[in-house]
Amino acid sequence: MPRITKAEMSRLLPVYFIMGSNNCTKEPLQVLRDALEGGITIFQLREKGEGALTGEKRIDFAKELQALCKEYGVPFIVNDDVELALELDADGVHVGQDDEGITSVREKMGDKIIGVSAHTIEEARFAIENGADYLGVGPIFPTSTKKDTKAVQGTKGLAHFREQGITMPIVGIGGITIENTAAVIEAGADGVSVISAISLAESAYESTRKLAEEVNKSL
């Protein structure tokens, strides 16, 4: 399989759902199925933090989520763990600035999808030059899901990436809700990534559907 093109990547980013077992109050597999039914376009397993599964339980959980994504034809991305991504033959991996370096990740992952979190123009350019397929930019708004986040950038911070000539597909990250999705897309993002807006929603299906509507209205 050749590397994904910019146009193909940008079509996968509109509703990017990130979840681990510890992000849900309901059964995680049902939450993911409801989100898939509602229209998520890409999924990332982020099984880390307090209460996260480890060892074989983590691998088994990942396989179950991956199988669901395959059923719906939605790419399955692994957060941070390149070895797990390779073991599962996942569609790709997402790495932060404190995770394994992009050059090493690209060598290991071949032509799979690689996303990189970028907080500055310099980080973005380095990621692009060394093989990133998309950038996760944020946090756009304050978030309670991640405890180790950088300073909030706002939609102006996201727009700055575009103003500086960054044409790589971008997904906005951090504190995104149905209500502020349109502003993120209008600032230049190809999509929004959410955790709690879907994982803790009363109806993951309805929340996903509304997020997709907001993105599509603004693209």
UniProtKB/Swiss-Prot annotation:
**Which cellular component, as a GO term, is one annotated location?**
cytoplasm
Keyword hit for Lipoprotein? no
Q: What is its EC number?
A: 2.5.1.3
**Pathway note:** Cofactor biosynthesis; thiamine diphosphate biosynthesis; thiamine phosphate from 4-amino-2-methyl-5-diphosphomethylpyrimidine and 4-methyl-5-(2-phosphoethyl)-thiazole: step 1/1
Asked whether the UniProt record includes Metal-binding among its keywords, one would answer yes
Q: Which residues bind Mg(2+)?
A: 80, 99
A Gene Ontology BP annotation from the UniProt entry: thiamine biosynthetic process
Q: How is the cofactor bound?
A: Binds 1 Mg(2+) ion per subunit.
Cofactor(s) essential for the protein: Mg(2+)
Q: Which SUPFAM superfamilies match?
A: Thiamin phosphate synthase
Q: Which UniProt keywords apply?
A: Magnesium, Metal-binding, Thiamine biosynthesis, Transferase
Q: Which residues bind 4-amino-2-methyl-5-(diphosphooxymethyl)pyrimidine?
A: 44-48, 79, 117, 146
Can you state which reaction this protein catalyses?
A: 2-[(2R,5Z)-2-carboxy-4-methylthiazol-5(2H)-ylidene]ethyl phosphate + 4-amino-2-methyl-5-(diphosphooxymethyl)pyrimidine + 2 H(+) = thiamine phosphate + CO2 + diphosphate; 2-(2-carboxy-4-methylthiazol-5-yl)ethyl phosphate + 4-amino-2-methyl-5-(diphosphooxymethyl)pyrimidine + 2 H(+) = thiamine phosphate + CO2 + diphosphate; 4-methyl-5-(2-phosphooxyethyl)-thiazole + 4-amino-2-methyl-5-(diphosphooxymethyl)pyrimidine + H(+) = thiamine phosphate + diphosphate
Q: Kindly list the GO molecular function terms attached to this UniProt entry.
A: magnesium ion binding; thiamine-phosphate diphosphorylase activity
Q: Which residues bind 2-[(2R,5Z)-2-carboxy-4-methylthiazol-5(2H)-ylidene]ethyl phosphate?
A: 143-145, 175, 195-196
Q: Which domain of life is it from?
A: Bacteria
Q: Which family does it belong to?
A: Belongs to the thiamine-phosphate synthase family.
Describe its function: Condenses 4-methyl-5-(beta-hydroxyethyl)thiazole monophosphate (THZ-P) and 2-methyl-4-amino-5-hydroxymethyl pyrimidine pyrophosphate (HMP-PP) to form thiamine monophosphate (TMP).
This chain belongs to which protein, by name? Thiamine-phosphate synthase
The organism of origin for this protein: Bacillus mycoides (strain KBAB4) (Bacillus weihenstephanensis)
